[in-house]
Amino acid sequence: MRSAKLKFEKRRSRIRHKISKTSNRVRLSIFKSGRHIYAQIIDDSKSITIAAASTLDEKIKKLKKSHCNIENAIKVGEEIAKKADSAGIKDVVFDRGGYKYHGVVKALADAAREKIKF
């Protein structure tokens, strides 16, 4: 029986492989830790990060003690969408990074989807 970490890594690599086929668009990547949630817009062809937002940003950090919750994920999604809009990015590929599309990942994606298209 495989460990949970091994299953997660396999799921993450499978998702990244599928996303790498659409190289003409930038990637909205999500990372969750125990306390925080991070979102980055990455251009893989140039290997640069175009925009980033997380619960460590000063605007969002002030809101609550627990940072990795749905309310703050919505704020991170709105912030990354605002930064993408100012950078002129309208179309991205959503990289959920091996996480289930549920809870904070879904909340962040729905909030970002209001200004960016995936």
UniProtKB/Swiss-Prot annotation:
One of its GO terms (cellular component) is cytosolic large ribosomal subunit. GO terms for molecular function: 5S rRNA binding; structural constituent of ribosome. It holds the Pfam family Ribosomal_L18p. Keywords: Ribonucleoprotein, Ribosomal protein, RNA-binding, rRNA-binding. Disulfide bonds: none annotated. GO terms for biological process: translation. It comes from the Bacteria. Belongs to the universal ribosomal protein uL18 family. This is one of the proteins that bind and probably mediate the attachment of the 5S RNA into the large ribosomal subunit, where it forms part of the central protuberance. Part of the 50S ribosomal subunit; part of the 5S rRNA/L5/L18/L25 subcomplex. Contacts the 5S and 23S rRNAs. This is Large ribosomal subunit protein uL18. The gene is rplR.
